[in-house]
Amino acid sequence: MHPSHAGDQRENGRRQPDFAALTRRETQVLALLASGQPNHSLARQLGISERTVRAHITSLTRKLGIPTRIEAALLAFQYRDTLSAP
């Protein structure tokens, strides 16, 4: 492997998102997005406000370079095993 590609993690030929850039809470929110539940349900499960859930979603989509909550949910579903790992 060429050293310039050492940091690349690939799955099915695509670069794996940099989940390490997320905070613990952002990772929790992202993992819960895979369930397709609305923000108020995520807020209730996490014991935080819906506004805080929206803030976490805004932050994690920016960090991962994805434009929408729906795409974040699809990404979370695709990597659900990675996100739920301890």
Locate each region found by the language model.
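Helix-turn-helix DNA-binding segment
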Residues: R10-T52, Y79
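Intrinsically disordered or compositionally simple regulatory linkers and C-terminal tails
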Residues: M1-F19, S84-P86
